[in-house]
């Protein structure tokens, strides 16, 4: 399913002395099956933008077309049930939203609200949990006896198991150890590729943005200032400084080596594996 923003603006507390325009005249198309990253400083409008993707927020002006349904400030909630099933959001620190006394009950909660087949959902959740390193008795375990990182994984799986077409992740790996972070991000990329899902990642981690995303949307002061593939984006050092966006570590390393040896690699590496290959090829030529 595709999602299209048409000149969308959103104002918090409109008509009061505290009104604030969080996003301004945003037009954006998100295509089925792609992995998008949305980046920008805190306060740039990222969270407001993603809450329009399944109509948790409705535009103050403009419209959002979600799989053919035109959402405006006049759209009634009763028309949005299907959209909210097909567009799943994992909010920042989702573990704070857990409340059931077993993983199984936690997994069942969302699907019950949408009258989904619980066996299918639980089977899918169980396989995902095994891929994330849980033991086979995980479904009967209490989330509240687990570490913060394990609770985060449970919360993420509870959304993935409902099989939404669009998966939105707001800082999903914040606070996770490196191994857990790799497990989660690799699983999400696998789901995108194998199941043709649309992934929308909000992140301050430029290493993840470079490694996993197909396209990057840059927000600044409530507007979209750039939409590009990560390789092109991270070549724009001057603009990135202006937007207060860090380079990925591997890009910094490559730039340092190019400067030190007064040379240029044929392309910008987006992950460590790419860089090692480029470096070996260059070193062999030398």
From Swiss-Prot:
Iron-sulfur as a keyword of this entry, yes or no, is: no
Family (UniProt)? Belongs to the ABC transporter superfamily. Energy-coupling factor EcfA family.
The entry's function note states: ATP-binding (A) component of a common energy-coupling factor (ECF) ABC-transporter complex. Unlike classic ABC transporters this ECF transporter provides the energy necessary to transport a number of different substrates.
Q: Which GO terms describe its cellular component?
A: ATP-binding cassette (ABC) transporter complex
Complexes and interactors: Forms a stable energy-coupling factor (ECF) transporter complex composed of 2 membrane-embedded substrate-binding proteins (S component), 2 ATP-binding proteins (A component) and 2 transmembrane proteins (T component).
GO molecular function annotation: ATP binding; ATP hydrolysis activity; ATPase-coupled transmembrane transporter activity
List the PROSITE patterns hit by this protein, alphabetically: ABC_TRANSPORTER_1 (PS00211), ABC_TRANSPORTER_2 (PS50893), CBIO (PS51246)
Q: Which PANTHER family match?
A: ENERGY-COUPLING FACTOR TRANSPORTER ATP-BINDING PROTEIN ECFA2, HEAVY METAL TRANSPORTER
Q: What is this protein called?
A: Energy-coupling factor transporter ATP-binding protein EcfA2
Supply the source organism's classification: Bacteria, Bacillati, Bacillota, Bacilli, Bacillales
Q: What is its EC number?
A: 7.-.-.-
């Amino acid at each position: 399913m595709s999602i299209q923003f048409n000149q969308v603006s959103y104002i918090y507390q409109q008509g009061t002395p505290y009104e604030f325009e969080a996003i301004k005249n945003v037009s954006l198309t998100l295509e089925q099956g792609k992995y998008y990253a949305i980046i920008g400083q805190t306060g740039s409008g990222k969270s407001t933008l993603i809450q329009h993707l399944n109509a948790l927020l409705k535009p103050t002006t403009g419209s959002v077309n979600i799989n053919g349904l035109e959402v405006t400030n006049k759209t009634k909630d009763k028309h949005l049930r299907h959209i909210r099933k097909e567009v799943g959001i994992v909010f920042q620190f989702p573990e704070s939203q857990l409340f059931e006394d077993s993983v199984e009950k936690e997994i069942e909660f969302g699907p019950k609200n949408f009258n989904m087949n619980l066996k299918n959902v639980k089977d899918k959740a169980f396989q995902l949990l095994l891929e994330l390193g849980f033991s086979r008795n995980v479904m009967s375990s209490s989330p509240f006896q687990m570490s913060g990182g394990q609770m985060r994984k449970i919360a993420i799986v509870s959304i993935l198991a409902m099989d939404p077409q669009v998966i939105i992740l707001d800082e999903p790996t914040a606070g996770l150890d490196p191994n857990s972070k790799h497990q989660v991000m690799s699983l999400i990329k696998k789901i995108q590729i194998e199941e043709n899902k649309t992934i929308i990642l909000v992140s301050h981690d430029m290493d993840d943005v470079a490694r996993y995303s197909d396209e990057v949307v840059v927000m600044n002061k409530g507007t979209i200032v750039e939409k590009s593939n990560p390789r092109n984006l991270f070549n724009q050092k001057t603009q990135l400084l202006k937007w207060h966006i860090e380079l990925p570590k591997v890009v910094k390393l490559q730039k340092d080596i190019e400067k030190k040896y007064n040379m240029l690699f044929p392309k910008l590496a987006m992950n460590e594996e790419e860089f090692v290959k480029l470096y070996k090829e260059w070193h062999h030529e030398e």
